[in-house]
Amino acid sequence: MDTIELYEIDSDYIKYLSSFEQHLFRNKKVTQVFTRKYIGIVLKINGFDYFVPLSSFKEKHKRLCETKDFIKVGTFSVINLNNMFPAPINLCKKVIIADLKDIHYRNLVRSEYRIIRQKTQLILQNAKAVYEHKMINDGKSKLSQRCNNFKLLEEKCKLYAKKI
């Protein structure tokens, strides 16, 4: 993967995976009328395409330092690598920033993307380190407890991919 790109993930796949993993975020709360886009980046890890979702920047993020699994994208969003999950690439739709209708949202996404590109190496290194840490220390450290169950989700990803 030469350049990092932004993707939107299929909401049915999120619904499917979230029944197996408590750390997986849904893109719509029960009280919401509209779903928000589940946007992130895709990285190749252990032979799988891993979707790494972007999360909205919150007030608490201002005082947090970056760690192996937590990367700030300016003051626009954050990347929680512990929340990444495997996804069939055909369920990931590339985000074309120029096609985004809302100018404010387009500018936000453009700014996020610029910073993500600048941090590509850090993101790739940390993602692989988080993955390896989880596989080696499953449940034995705070970091591994925060992580999705990558092994389980890889199995569920394979099963889902066979059905599509």
Can you describe what each PLM-predicted range is?
Residues 10, 55, 88:
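Residues at the C-termini of beta-strands that transition into short coil/loop
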Residues 29-33, 44-80:
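Compact nucleic-acid interaction/catalytic patches
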Residues 1, 8-34:
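An N-terminal domain-cap segment
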Residues 13, 58, 91:
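Residue-level detector of flexible, active-site-proximal loop/helix-junction positions
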Residues 1-2, 164:
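Intrinsically disordered, low-complexity and often Lys/Arg-enriched segments
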Residues 72-164:
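C-terminal terminal-subdomain/extension
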